[in-house]
A protein has these predicted regions:
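Membrane-embedded and interfacial regions of multi-pass energy-transducing membrane proteins
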Residues: 2-546
């Protein structure tokens, strides 16, 4: 009977409810739209990774023998723009937020299904402008578009890239609005705020940042394009403008944007750590509120990127102090995850390996961020490879590792197939080892004084650069492996079943892959979040059935 039931479910899941390209391109099913995003950002991830490998190959030798200096400027710019705006910012919210938020709260879809589809098309249009800029000579301003270089001196295609970033911003805003309204209005009966999965809390906080912060970036980028075309004199000091105004506006969005990339990963960690330690999350309320605190404090620390830009000493001291404060809610999360692991029944499936990697790498990134928040240290290492290493420990060690963790954890739910565990574990180890070999030497390089964005360097730095390039090669293999074995699993993987990990949460109470509208009947929630003691029968008074 069970086999027959699963067979029936397989005939009616969201993947085969309709066929043909048109059914995918016009779908309003949040799960299909999530897969459209997944396919898109995967392409951009490997495009950005290709630029990164060219950068590392250029830095193998002190003279920089691979490309010209102007080409090198374009490589690190295009790497940053593609990775940040076309992968990291949309990655978890657009893929797993889209796929999981409705199922986690017992809804049949997001609040605005057509707006959700429009968000993906807007993202693709914006990405098209950025790709056009790349194909017509590239961009050399750095991903930050700093003025007055971007508005006056750069000979690259700044306007097309700026329009691309502007357009993709609307996709981010619409995704955030959709998630906020869905969480407020479409929760299942009994699913109170204090019963919500921490994944939902993290995405809710992220969505608030998207809605409030992204318009500032959009306006700023449009001003850059207009100044470049019409010389309005907003940022150009020769025309009475103020280049520092651009930095204030840009970082007012771009520091909270760090949390757009990290907060969703933190939500993933809470789900995975609770599942594979078979425990309730320690200090649920504190972890939930820390997401809100990060969203609020993230808007108050933007000027710590500007300690050497000419802001007053008084302002630098204030923003330095606020930078120390913003580390507290992140530290609360790390402490509570660690406490959850204590005396847990821990198993080491692939998602848990990525969770451990996240905790270690993100902690390293966070601690070095506190160093950079201290003005005296920042003056010494700003614009060196110390900043590059810190940024990548947060963005890759946090954002990309969290994405891979989520991909492996929910892959059976998304596809109904299991991946080969041995290859997945090998990939996780290669990512961890390759990442540390790539970026830890860069802390040393930065402290020794090697500036970033230079295509040539003194011979004394070569050994550490060779180590970094070797690590990048290992990291590339670790990133390529999941694409291969996950694609293989679609055809040859074992059937997953509804809940292969015996996980808590409403998304595991429907078929794998889920049916069109997620649930045959609206679920009624009568239990607390992360009730693994009840699931495993270890709670006092709960009997194990069967």
């Amino acid at each position: 009977m069970e086999t027959a039931s699963h067979s029936t479910e397989a005939k009616t899941n969201y993947l085969n409810a309709d066929y043909g390209i048109k059914s995918w391109l016009l779908t309003t099913d949040h799960k299909r739209i999530a897969l459209l995003y997944l396919g898109s950002i995967t392409v951009f991830f490997f495009l950005g990774g290709f630029f990164a490998m060219l950068i590392r190959l250029e830095l193998l030798t002190p003279a920089g023998d691979l490309v010209l200096s102007d080409t090198y400027n374009k490589l690190f710019t295009m790497h940053g723009v593609v990775m940040i705006f076309l992968f990291l910012i949309p990655s978890i919210p657009a893929v797993f937020g889209n796929f999981l938020v409705p199922m986690m709260i017992g809804a049949k879809d997001l609040a605005f299904p057509k707006l959700n589809l429009a968000s993906w098309y807007i993202f693709i249009i914006g990405a098209g402008f950025i790709l056009y800029a790349i194909l017509t000579g590239g961009l050399d301003t750095g991903w930050t578009f700093y003025t007055p270089y971007s508005t006056t001196y750069s000979n690259s295609n700044v306007v097309a890239a700026a329009l691309g970033v502007f357009i993709t911003g609307f996709s981010s805003i619409f995704t955030g609005l959709n998630i906020i309204v869905t969480v407020h209005r479409m929760r299942a009966p009994g699913l109170t705020w204090r019963r919500l999965p921490l994944f939902i809390w993290a995405h809710y906080a992220t969505s608030v940042i998207m809605v409030l912060g992204t318009p500032v970036l959009a306006i700023t980028i449009v001003l850059v394009a207009l100044e470049r075309l019409f010389h309005f004199g907003i940022f150009d000091p020769r025309l009475g403008g103020d280049p520092l105004l651009f930095q204030h506006l840009f970082w007012f969005y771009s520091h909270p944007a760090v949390y757009i990339m990290i907060l969703p990963s933190m939500g993933v960690m809470s789900e995975v750590i609770a599942c594979f330690s078979r425990k309730r999350i320690f200090g649920y309320d504190f972890v939930a509120m820390s997401s809100v605190a990060i969203a609020v404090l993230g808007f108050l620390v933007w000027a710590h990127h500007m300690f050497v830009a000419g802001i007053s000493t008084y302002a630098a001291m204030i923003f330095s102090l606020l930078t120390f404060f913003v580390a507290i809610p992140s530290a609360v999360k790390v402490f509570n995850w660690t406490a959850t692991l204590y005396k847990g029944s821990i198993t080491f499936e692939t998602p848990m390996l990525y969770a451990f990697a996240f905790i270690g790498l993100f902690t390293m990134g966070g601690l070095t961020g506190v160093f950079l928040g201290a003005v005296a240290i920042d003056l010494h290492v700003t614009d060196t490879y110390f900043v590059v290493a810190h940024f990548h420990y947060v963005m890759v060690g946090g954002g990309v590792t969290g994405f891979l963790c989520a991909l492996h954890f929910w892959w059976p739910k998304m596809t109904g197939k299991m991946y080969p565990e041995a290859f997945a574990k090998l990939s996780a180890v290669l990512v961890f080892v390759g990442f540390n070999l790539t970026f830890f030497p860069q802390f040393v390089l930065g402290y020794m004084g090697m500036p970033r964005r230079y295509h040539a360097y003194p011979p004394e730095f070569q050994v550490l650069n060779v180590m970094s390039t070797a690590g990048a090669s290992i990291l590339a293999v670790g990133f390529l492996m999941p694409m291969i074995y996950l694609a293989w699993s679609l055809q040859y993987g074992k059937e997953a079943g509804p809940n292969p990990y015996r996980a808590a949460g409403l998304e595991w109470m429907t078929a794998s892959p889920p049916p069109d509208f997620n649930f045959d009947e609206t679920p009624v929630v009568t239990w607390e979040a992360y009730n693994y003691d009840e699931i495993d029968g270890t709670k006092k008074g709960v009997e194990v059935v069967g």
